[in-house]
Amino acid sequence: MKSQLLSLAVAVSTISQGVVGQEPFGWPFKPMVTQDDLQNKIKLKDIMAGVEKLQSFSDAHPEKNRVFGGNGHKDTVEWIYNELKATGYYNVKKQEQVHLWSHAEAALSANGKDLKASAMSYSPPANKIMAELVVAKNNGCNATDYPENTQGKIVLIQRGVCSFGEKSSQAGDAKAIGAVVYNNVPGSLAGTLGGLDKRHVPTAGLSQEDGKNLASLVASGKVDVTMNVVSLFENRTTWNVIAETKGGDHNNVVMLGAHSDSVDAGPGINDNGSGSIGIMTVAKALTNFKLNNAVRFAWWTAEEFGLLGSTFYVDSLDDRELHKVKLYLNFDMIGSPNFANQIYDGDGSAYNMTGPAGSAEIEYLFEKFFDDQGLPHQPTAFTGRSDYSAFIKRNVPAGGLFTGAEVVKTPEQVKLFGGEAGVAYDKNYHGKGDTVANINKGAIFLNTRAIAYSVAEYARSLKGFPTRPKTGKRAVNPQYAKMPGGGCGHHTVFM
């Protein structure tokens, strides 16, 4: 007994002096993390308290949102930072950056009939321009897609294959004075041009139904369009929050993230307060355990304006530092009211878009989580249009979960997941109604447990996980530019 007490005293003394790496106080006496134990620490009351806190940050300011650089988002960043710092378990930092904020509104009419349009962020302004409408072939991604008489006209373009910014640029190169992009799936269309570009023309988004109707009208006669776009621009200082466990192997980092900002229209509690609080809840639960591999949590800023925060972070890492990140997990909208359990298609089997080596294994891990509980799931297109984009471009394996946005649920999906057919996964997507009341408690609880399941697995061991290649390409078939699922973090950001 005496020798055991002496050993204990030496261990405590050594830890208190900070000799054992960066490990937090009490680390040797914590149990090793397991999937079951970490999942059991996840409580719905903690999750809901978190999303209610984010709602309060939005409610506290006249803007009623948490858009990057605004007061609601500043409160969000400070709270996340302070909550993690207080655990003593993490090294926490705020990564400062400056990005251009843009807010735009559009009004559109065709042959005197008003249409419901959304201006693309970073669109050039348009002061009630009036012109004949022409239709681009294919998806408007190439110069040959534009009619010879495009000059001086407004051009109608179908969504898909290339980014909104590229479509706007191609329209500008063809001498169009405006562009209208319509959806290739049911529902309205909102998005961003990704930044300012002198090639861009005033650009608005339109629903699939309205876009098809306009194309039919052009085919049978002349259509005159009036377009008005009001755009505001402002440089804003903002921050990512990065928290890495003090313990664990820092040369084998398991990384996961969620964007912490909202759109201008509302508080963004599902998009993406759900993902932000999901990983926050897991981060707090993880403090009860020790682990073998370091875990790094990230809350990204300015995702809604073109993945700006995550791109800034990845660009700040040289190859040596990024190689320490063995995989990246992304969680964007995990509490949709009319949800479906969707897993990024890392192996490309559903959409012919593969992630870097290891992405398939991440997909299989999440499939196992649902399968073990007898729960249905489906793939969602792994297009690289969320905060994992910058990671896969540098060959970091990636994956994650998503419960749906503006795309409507089918009768077949209702048989799997319940809910209501013909209604969007999240009817309040990118709207003022995206509040705490918009959250499906069952979905957010289940998906947060899935986050815990994956973190525990990889924090314990990366044995058998594929070695990352030095170079790699993701196979992309343009026919799959039409994506089910939709939403922030999938295909509305750019395409």
Swiss-Prot record:
Binding of Zn(2+) 2, residues: 271, 304, 430
Family listed: Belongs to the peptidase M28 family. M28A subfamily.
Quaternary structure and partners: Monomer.
Gene Ontology biological-process annotations: proteolysis
Binding positions for Zn(2+) 1 per the UniProt entry: 259, 271, 332
UniProt keyword Repeat present: no
Lineage: superkingdom: Eukaryota
Keyword Cytoplasm: no
Keywords assigned: Aminopeptidase, Glycoprotein, Hydrolase, Metal-binding, Metalloprotease, Protease, Secreted, Signal, Virulence, Zinc
Organism: Trichophyton equinum
Covalent S-S links between cysteines: none
Domain PA: 124-218
Phylogenetic placement of the source organism: Eukaryota, Fungi, Dikarya, Ascomycota, Pezizomycotina
Gene Ontology molecular-function annotations: aminopeptidase activity; metal ion binding; metalloexopeptidase activity
Cofactor or coenzyme needed: Zn(2+)
Gene that this polypeptide is encoded by: LAP2
Location within or outside the cell: Secreted
UniProt-recorded name of the protein: Leucine aminopeptidase 2
PANTHER family according to UniProt: METALLOPEPTIDASE M28 FAMILY MEMBER (PTHR12147), PEPTIDE HYDROLASE (PTHR12147:SF57)
Enzyme Commission numbers on file: 3.4.11.-
Manner of cofactor binding, per the entry note: Binds 2 Zn(2+) ions per subunit.
Signal sequence range: 1-21
Function description: Extracellular aminopeptidase that releases a wide variety of amino acids from natural peptides and contributes to pathogenicity.
Cellular compartments per GO CC: extracellular region
Stored Pfam families: PA (PF02225), Peptidase_M28 (PF04389)
